[in-house]
């Protein structure tokens, strides 16, 4: 059959992920945007934006980009290289069942996983309520007064507990006692944290070796890593007598049956909520918890959700006591924690809401009964089982049979834990089935069935729990799945995430988290692998990590990568520890000064302080660049003790500084190293490599540049890249035999989310990644151009360009109309937008980062909203609007405002449907402006009474 003469084949590629799915503007839209910016081509704009002195010489190249289907096939092939074996290794990681209703409606729901940290409380009420449930759950189970909204992992939480103890203890000792029954990874992390700060770690049997007179605190594992369940009440009382602090690392599932740490007198409790429905995922991510006595709440790290009121007096939630955090206190902060594990904390809290106290107790009892049955069978075979009392973990003395039994267990598709040279550890969980127990018995040479053994309790009677927990009605209201689904939907509808609108947060890179990238994280071949399995059972993971590491090295110009840091702040810390170890290895342990510009992110000075360094602040010029005269002077002044400098590139002011190479040369000349914060890597990929311009180490925020979602405040990943001379000092891990420098509980951090970044790289290819960077720069310059005349862009390059973000000045609005940056942020909610980054790095400004994923239409909607806000401020300044009773001061407006009595001098239409706001699909803030002062003065950090829920539902 002949073709019609006018028929032609299209060159349109429907599965071109980079250009059709990830990058927002179409080629035609880019042309329109370039005209507004004033450039004939995208390359011409890039040439004027990125200094030639730092431009990458060779393009990124690692094969053609894959389609979504090709990438998913590659991921499936890789996942199948992981061997699915039932792991009874324990050691803080356990099999768990994620209720499908939670997997579908939380973990796989972009309304939850694409949200940002809830700094804007009005548009985060759903997430904040879920986190308040988490805090309530933790307080109930631990028997303590105040809990935070998650930490990175149990080992990190233990290190934070040690830091609190040193800060608040009356004892002036410089030693910290660690129970030898703590998990090995916890002990390793405690040693890492203590060494730079000059604290001594004493590991031993607390009932024999603890001298409370010489320590500022102690931590005990409950139950212990080898299974022991012990009462620490007497030891804790002795510590208190001598002015020391007591912390307990407790398994929350065990606390359903056991006396709480608070009832023992503990000051701090930490642990992991992983077994509350969060898969092990080769080490993470999981939400750790921390709870403290009320007296220590202001020393607690991380986010803390509290109850406040809005402008109408209605209940509202917000982040409380923020003045203790790194973004406020910098090197004086309680911790460098920024990203935590909000998405996983939400999952754990929903697990408790779904099961309630009866369900949690039943699961705990079932796990214990299965463990008792297992022990009875092993004892019948003649083995010595320790300890006498336990919850879910036993240790078996096997002598020279250790290797044979471990091998036999693997043949039964079961992993057991190797302890020393003569013992085997076994930990059961809610996924353990009768056939699992029978397989273990066979590995030990027995042929039993579970019904041969009657389970009983092997818990000490004096430690059986008698106090209630999860008593709040929220843990009793949603047992029916229909109600559970609706509850999660109601919470999600209160929030504003990327599934509704762009989130133009400067320095946060809220880009597309593509569905194809997210799918593999729930595959059991990735999600059910224990972090301490033999290497030959995780070949898929090792291939993925190695290939992603090679790609990141190619992108950054570094020689080696560590995937262990599970947040950007932990990456900073790991990089600074590598620099410190390098200096010590070269006999320069006296080098402890870190130069940091005043514009640096708050985690920079906080991390430097944790690494044992002295922070020396460097001035920033009026142009937003490092003040070179001051930098040279400080480098010269501290030449003998200079350890490093920390810089962000492009700068936190949104420009490529021309003098970055000179900065690096000055530091190296004076014996220091250069830490380049990779938070703004989205402006560099494919165009410039940190390792080529003089930097020695950087962390990369995979939850920014490489598409891991922010999850409402975590998870994140902060791997570090280093030049060859620092490679020997990358983080080690006890499981790999390298005990020094561990910064996370698992060897590869939050490994189960690495498939997201890997698939992003596969689908974009080197060319696509470079194009994404260029479009990110175009979008930022387009926004700056559209806002020209209404708002001043504070910082530009010599050629008038910004990098991937821009800072607009809202201070003139305050001067002329009394309109604050907070007013602008709240008015943007009425328009359906999350505000840009507020008052950082300059007070009274907004930092806008649109990313490459936003279309021209969405950018225009955002710009229209800001321009309309500027006109409202002008109307106030000119007397056409009241200075107090106006749409800006009263924002955000709610449905209750719309339908209630209206006595305001502006219309409902103007209040609720400003330019930029959708009419049919408008986002409505569930609360009016939240009262921050009230929330801190009347601190409540657990669920409010049930009456308030009934009121909210009316």
Swiss-Prot record:
Source organism (scientific name): Sinorhizobium medicae (strain WSM419)
UniProt GO MF annotations: glycine binding; glycine dehydrogenase (decarboxylating) activity; pyridoxal phosphate binding
Description of how the protein assembles with itself and partners: The glycine cleavage system is composed of four proteins: P, T, L and H.
Protein name: Glycine dehydrogenase (decarboxylating)
Lineage, top ranks: Bacteria, Pseudomonadati, Pseudomonadota, Alphaproteobacteria, Hyphomicrobiales
NCBIfam families reported for this sequence: gcvP, PRK00451.1
Enzyme superclass (EC): oxidoreductase
Enzyme Commission number(s) of this protein: 1.4.4.2
Cited function: The glycine cleavage system catalyzes the degradation of glycine. The P protein binds the alpha-amino group of glycine through its pyridoxal phosphate cofactor; CO(2) is released and the remaining methylamine moiety is then transferred to the lipoamide cofactor of the H protein.
Positions where N6-(pyridoxal phosphate)lysine occurs in the chain: 704
């Amino acid at each position: 059959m002949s073709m019609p003469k006018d028929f032609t084949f299209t060159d349109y590629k429907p599965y071109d992920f980079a250009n059709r799915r990830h990058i927002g503007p179409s080629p035609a839209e880019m042309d329109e945007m370039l005209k507004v910016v004033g450039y004939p081509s995208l390359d011409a704009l890039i040439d004027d934006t990125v200094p030639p002195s730092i431009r990458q010489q060779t393009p990124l190249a690692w094969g053609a980009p894959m389609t979504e289907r090709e990438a998913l096939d590659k991921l499936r092939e890789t996942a199948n290289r992981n061997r699915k074996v039932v792991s009874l290794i324990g050691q803080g990681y356990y099999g768990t069942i994620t209720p499908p209703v939670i997997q579908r409606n939380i973990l796989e729901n972009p309304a939850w996983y694409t949200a940002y940290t809830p700094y804007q409380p009005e548009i985060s009420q759903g997430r904040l309520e879920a986190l308040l449930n988490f805090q309530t759950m933790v307080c109930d189970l631990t028997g303590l007064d105040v809990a935070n909204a998650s930490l990175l992992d149990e080992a990190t939480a233990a290190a934070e507990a040690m830091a609190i103890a040193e800060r608040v203890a009356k004892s002036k000792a410089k030693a910290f006692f660690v129970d030898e029954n703590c998990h090995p990874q916890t002990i390793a992390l405690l040693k890492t944290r203590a060494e730079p700060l000059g604290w001594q770690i004493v590991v031993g049997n607390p009932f024999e070796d603890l001298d409370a007179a010489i320590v500022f605190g102690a931590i005990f594992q409950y139950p212990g890593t080898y299974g022991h369940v012990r009462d620490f009440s007497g030891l804790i009382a002795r510590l208190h007598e001598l002015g020391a602090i007591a912390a307990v690392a407790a398994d929350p599932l065990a606390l359903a049956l056991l006396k709480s740490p608070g009832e023992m007198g503990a000051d701090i409790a930490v642990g992991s909520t992983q077994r509350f429905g969060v898969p092990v995922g080769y080490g993470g991510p999981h939400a750790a918890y921390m709870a403290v006595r009320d007296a220590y709440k202001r020393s607690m790290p991380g986010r803390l959700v509290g109850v406040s009121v809005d402008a109408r007096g209605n209940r509202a939630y917000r982040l409380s006591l923020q003045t203790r955090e790194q973004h406020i206190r910098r090197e004086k902060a309680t911790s460098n924690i920024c990203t935590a594990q909000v998405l996983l904390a939400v999952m754990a809290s929903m697990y408790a809401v779904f099961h309630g106290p009866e369900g949690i107790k039943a699961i705990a009892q079932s796990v214990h009964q299965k463990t008792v049955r297992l022990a009875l069978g092993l004892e019948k075979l003649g083995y010595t089982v320790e300890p006498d009392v336990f919850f879910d973990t036993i240790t078996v003395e096997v002598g020279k049979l250790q290797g044979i039994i471990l091998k036999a267990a693997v043949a039964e598709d079961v992993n057991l834990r190797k302890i020393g040279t003569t013992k085997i550890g076994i930990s059961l969980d809610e996924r353990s089935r009768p056939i699992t127990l029978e397989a273990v018995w066979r590995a030990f040479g027995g042929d039993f069935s579970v019904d041969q053994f009657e389970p009983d309790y092997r818990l000490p009677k004096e430690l059986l729990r008698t106090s209630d927990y999860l008593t709040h009605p929220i843990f009793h209201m949603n047992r029916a799945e229909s109600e559970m689904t609706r509850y999660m939907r109601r919470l999600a509808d209160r929030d504003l995430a990327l599934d509704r609108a762009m989130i133009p947060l400067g320095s946060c890179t809220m880009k597309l988290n593509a569905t194809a990238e997210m799918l593999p994280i729930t595959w059991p071949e990735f999600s059910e692998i224990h972090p301490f399995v033999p290497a030959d059972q995780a070949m898929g993971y090792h291939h993925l990590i190695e290939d992603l590491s090679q790609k990141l090295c190619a992108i950054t110009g570094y020689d080696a990568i560590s995937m262990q840091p599970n947040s950007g702040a932990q990456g900073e810390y790991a990089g600074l520890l590598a620099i410190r170890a390098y200096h010590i290895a070269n006999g320069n342990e006296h080098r402890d000064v870190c130069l940091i510009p005043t514009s640096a992110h708050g985690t920079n000075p906080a991390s430097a302080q944790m690494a044992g360094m002295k922070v020396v602040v460097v001035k920033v010029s009026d142009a937003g660049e490092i003040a070179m005269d001051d930098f040279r002077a400080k480098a010269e002044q501290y030449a003998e003790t200079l350890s490093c400098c920390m810089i962000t590139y492009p700068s936190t002011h949104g420009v490529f500084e021309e003098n970055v190479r000179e900065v690096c040369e000055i530091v190296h000349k004076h014996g220091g190293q250069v830490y380049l914060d990779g938070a703004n890597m989205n402006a560099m990929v494919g165009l410039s490599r940190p390792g080529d311009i003089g930097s020695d180490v950087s962390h990369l925020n995979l939850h920014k540049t490489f598409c891991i979602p922010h999850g409402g405040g975590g998870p994140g990943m902060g791997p570090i890249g280093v030049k060859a001379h620092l490679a020997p000092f990358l983080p080690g891990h006890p499981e790999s035999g390298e005990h020094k420098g561990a910064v996370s509980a698992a060897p590869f951090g939050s490994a189960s989310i690495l498939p997201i970044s890997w698939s992003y790289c596969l689908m974009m290819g080197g060319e696509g990644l470079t194009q994404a960077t260029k479009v990110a720069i175009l979008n930022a310059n387009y926004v700056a151009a559209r806002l020209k005349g209404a708002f001043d862009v504070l910082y530009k390059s010599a050629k008038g360009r910004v990098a991937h973000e821009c800072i607009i000045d809202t201070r003139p609005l305050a001067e002329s109309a009394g309109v604050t940056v907070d007013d602008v942020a709240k008015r943007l909610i009425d328009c359906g937008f999350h505000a840009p980054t507020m008052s950082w790095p300059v007070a009274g400004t907004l930092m806008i980062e649109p990313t490459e994923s936003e279309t021209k239409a969405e950018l225009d909607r955002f710009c229209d909203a800001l321009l309309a806000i500027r006109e409202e401020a002008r109307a106030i300044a000119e007397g056409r609007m009241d200075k107090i009773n106006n749409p800006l001061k009263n924002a955000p407006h709610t449905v209750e405002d719309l339908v209630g009595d209206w006595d305001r001098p502006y219309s409902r239409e103007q209040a609720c449907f400003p330019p930029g706001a959708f009419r049919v699909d408008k986002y409505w803030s569930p609360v009016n402006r939240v009262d921050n002062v009230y929330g801190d003065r009347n601190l409540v950090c657990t669920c409010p009474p049930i009456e308030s829920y009934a009121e909210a539902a009316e």
